[in-house]
Amino acid sequence: MANIVSRTDAEAIIREQVVSTIFQDAPKQSVFMSMAKKLPNMTSNQTRIRVLDFLPTAYWVNGDTGMKQTSRQAWDNVYLNAAELAVIVPISEAVLSDAEFDIFGEITPRVNEAIGQRVDAAIIFGNNRPAEWPNDIITMARQAGNNVAVSGTPDYYNLLLGENGVISKIEDDGYMATGALAAMGMRAKLRGIRTTEGIPLFKSDMQGSTQYSLDGAPLHFPQNGAFDANVAQLIVGDFSQAVYAIRQDVTVKILDQGVIQDPVTKEIVYNLAQQDMVALRIVFRMGWALPNPATRMDEDRVGCAFAYLEPTTPATTQTVTST
C-alpha cells in the first residue's frame, strides 16, 4: 500500500492564517449628550442656572381715568450637580508585554462607550441614577401626564402623530419636538404604517435606506444598550430644553502602585507593585438638568418637554422620587 503524508501528519507544522485585526463593532457614544444642550464646563461640583419662574401680565385700562394694575416677574434657581462615573481595569504587566495588540488602546474606547451607556440609562430611564441628580426624563414626563398607553390593537400613526399622541403631548405644554429616540423594534412598526391605499408612510421603496423622522424631528435608534424597551417604545421631546455640563472630562491614568480593594468586602484584591500589575483608571464627572422655565403655554411649570409611548405591556414597578 502506498504511503502519503496526510494533513493529519503535517498538522503540527501547518500555520493557520491569523487576521491582524480584531473583529468588533464601532464603540457607541451617548445619544443624550449628542442631542441635549451643552453648557460651559463646570468649575465646581455644583452649577447654578437662573430660570424664569413667573411671567408678568398686562391689563386693559378701563376708560380715560382707569387705574393701571401692577404685575411682577420672578426667577428661580436650578442646580446641576456633578456625579462621577469611574472604573479601574487591572492587568498583569506580563500580559501587556506579551499581547499582540495595544490592550489599553483597545480598552479605552470601550470604557468610553460604557460611560455613554450609563449616562443615557440614568438620565433617560433612571437606571442606577446618582442621588445627586434630578428625576429621569421618563419619570418627569409621566408626572406631567405625557405618557401614552398602547391599546390591544395599536394604531401607531395616531399614537405618534394624532390627537393625544406623544407629539401632541409636548405641543400642549408649549414645546416643539426636536428629536426622538426609539427601541430598535419600533423600526418594524414604523415600516408597517400604511395609508388607506396600503402605501407605506415611512418607506418609499424596498432598496433605499430610510431616514426616519416624526413631524420633521429626526428619530434615532440607540445602539449602546441604554434604551429600555420595557419602559418605553419611543421618547420624543425638545432636547434643547435639557442641559448638561461636564465637570471632569474623561481622564485616563495608569496606576502601577497601590492596592485595589473589593468595593463590598473592602478586602485587598490586588497589590499592583507586589504582583507586577498595572491598572487603567478612567474617571468622568458631569451634571444635567431639565430647567422647565415658565412659558405662556405653561406658566405654572407643571408641563414637560418630553413624552413617551408606553410598551404594549407597560412596566408596573417603577421607583419614583419626587423633588
Could you describe each region identified by the protein language model?
Residues 14-17, 44, 102, 106-110, ...:
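Generic recognition of stable, solvent-exposed alpha-helical segments in well-folded globular domains
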Residues 63-68, 103-108, 196-197, 294-305, ...:
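Short intrinsically disordered coil segments
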Residues 2-87:
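Assembly/oligomerization interface modules of large self-assembling protein complexes
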Residues 55-58, 86, 95, 117, ...:
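Short loop/turn segments at secondary-structure transitions that flank enzyme active sites
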Residues 43, 140-278, 284, 318-322:
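Extended oligomerization regions of viral-like shell subunits
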